[in-house]
Amino acid sequence: MKKIQFFDTTLRDGEQTPGVNFDVKEKIQIALQLEKLGIDVIEAGFPISSPGDFECVKAIAKAIKHCSVTGLARCVEGDIDRAEEALKDAVSPQIHIFLATSDVHMEYKLKMSRAEVLASIKHHISYARQKFDVVQFSPEDATRSDRAFLIEAVQTAIDAGATVINIPDTVGYTNPTEFGQLFQDLRREIKQFDDIIFASHCHDDLGMATANALAAIENGARRVEGTINGIGERAGNTALEEVAVALHIRKDFYQAETNIVLNQFKNSSDLISRLSGMPVPRNKAVIGGNAYAHESGIHQDGVLKNPDTYEIITPALVGVDKNSLPLGKLSGKHAFNTRMEEMGYTLTEQEQKDAFKRFKQLADAKKEVTEEDLHALILGQSSESADDFELKHLQVQYVTGGVQGAIVRIEERDGALVEDAATGSGSIEAIYNTINRLMKQDIELTDYRIQAITAGQDAQAEVHVVIKNDKGAVFHGIGIDFDVLTASAKAYLQASGKSKTASKQADFEEVK
């Protein structure tokens, strides 16, 4: 039975999803959940890319105690040095170095010859090996690279000290047959194939990321890279939950085992979906809302008689608890804290007190507080506590001729209260125009989405917005409230606050 490592890049490649932007606290929260999930390696970011990314990688490296943390780096000494500095507090640091090997990338992006690429790989892998025990090399766009040159580049990296070789299907171009053959070729040509770890990194442009990752495992890969929910650039990455469950359900075929705690997938998926603002499609494999629903009468009859007739995956396997009892206003602190632990949250004593207080307020307004309500409660508490601006007052009124007016008062982190008013063609536009005046920013709303957290007339509204500022930076905001307009204002204020804070940090860096 072979052991397959899981390498999660939700915080790096996953964050490249348009409209997704995690802050430091959110990234730490995700990383801690990935640790509970049993992920072997967490790719925390690209330290050289920005001061913010450096600080995120540094914070995650310090917070994680039971798995490896890695950072991305180009074949540049400065990148490697920056990664070393960011990861110095990690219990088990690794580095991930990449350089393109396809002709189109070398000619048009790198403007380097094959000889220059090989020399760069040799030098920088050797340089990194002096600083890290585990060095992973990725020949970017491997599946469109000349096969002989790809093998030469991989051999060069191994000879220079690489301990992990990752084969990226950067643009989602390959198929399972071709990808499996590529790993067979590597196994035949690379003399140290069994002495180091080979990995796959697949994209889903043609809908084959999971199939390609499994083909790689079938043909010798011992590490799989991907993200939770398959989020990522363009069509996304390999969905790790799909690979993990496939290996478990078809252990007879793949003969593989992992460190993954399968019943933590639902918690992981829910957390990342809410923080990213990307809902999980209902028909998504493994963790979609319809994954265990049966509409056909024949199917329903079969499942009632024996679930094995139509279910190869039980809901409980991935952490879907259909029998979880809702909490109510008579539920005590112990029951609440126990449920938080079951849902995967790690809260400090003060956070527990604050969350329980909010829970009691919520329980007074709702007959039953469901697990979805609790996820929203923790998400709201986490996001609002990190905000520099808090909504204190909102008033909307009809003016004339279909025009709406809004008065908004916010409190800044230093306690200062500011208030302004504006109009718009509707309530939402009036509120957002007012917030723009208060924040003194030129903001474009690019996405607005509202959903009910639970069923019923007493459901809370959860609003997600995506905005773009005048510098082209994109920010995501979440607002939760029983009142739709208040939830909308909270979401927009949060996103605008992130934009304003980021602009201040950028200005500070320029002054430095």
From Swiss-Prot:
A Gene Ontology cellular-component term = cytoplasm
Write down the Pfam families for this protein, in alphabetical order: HCS_D2, HMGL-like, LeuA_dimer
Q: Which residues are Mn(2+)-binding?
A: 13, 201, 203, 237
Q: Which GO terms describe its biological process?
A: L-leucine biosynthetic process
Gene Ontology molecular function terms on file: 2-isopropylmalate synthase activity; acetyl-CoA C-acetyltransferase activity; manganese ion binding
Q: Which residues form the Pyruvate carboxyltransferase domain?
A: 4-266
Task: List the pathway annotation.
Answer: Amino-acid biosynthesis; L-leucine biosynthesis; L-leucine from 3-methyl-2-oxobutanoate: step 1/4
What EC number(s) does the entry state? 2.3.3.13
Keyword Lipid metabolism belongs to the record: no
Per its database record, what is this protein's job? Catalyzes the condensation of the acetyl group of acetyl-CoA with 3-methyl-2-oxobutanoate (2-ketoisovalerate) to form 3-carboxy-3-hydroxy-4-methylpentanoate (2-isopropylmalate).
UniProt protein name: 2-isopropylmalate synthase
